Amino acid sequence: MRQNQLIEKVTAGQLRSDIPAFRAGDTVRVHALIVEGTRERVQIFEGVVIKRHGAGISATYTVRKISNGIGVERTFPLHSPRVEKIEVVRYGRVRRAKLYYLRERTGKSARIAERRRDK
């Protein structure tokens, strides 16, 4: 068995199946488990996905939000057990895979148009 096949076999059991389809430009609500002292609690981080990176077990995504007038970005592993769930709030229409230009934008220029979804 090749090394690549062995890695895929080991990580296949750790991949999550409850991840919704989302991409850059979508607004998501991430329910992340955080540890404060001895207790764990769920912290909700809601913002725009500015990038997705990688594939398989090492895939990540970065979410950006504005908190008290300051831009906050947080990168989450896609298949992390520390993320309880991911909710897609709205689907954005963008023409780029990486939305780094949103870092310089504020106010109305940072808005993203909603993608139309046919049912």
Swiss-Prot record:
InterPro entries: Ribosomal_bL19, Ribosomal_bL19_CS, Ribosomal_bL19_sf, Translation_prot_SH3-like_sf. GO terms for biological process: translation. It holds the Pfam family Ribosomal_L19. GO terms for molecular function: structural constituent of ribosome. The keyword Signal does not apply. One of its GO terms (cellular component) is cytosolic large ribosomal subunit. Keywords: Ribonucleoprotein, Ribosomal protein. The keyword Ribonucleoprotein applies. SUPFAM superfamilies: Translation proteins SH3-like domain. PANTHER family: LARGE RIBOSOMAL SUBUNIT PROTEIN BL19M, RIBOSOMAL PROTEIN L19. HAMAP family: Ribosomal_bL19. This protein is located at the 30S-50S ribosomal subunit interface and may play a role in the structure and function of the aminoacyl-tRNA binding site. This is Large ribosomal subunit protein bL19. It comes from Limosilactobacillus fermentum (strain NBRC 3956 / LMG 18251).
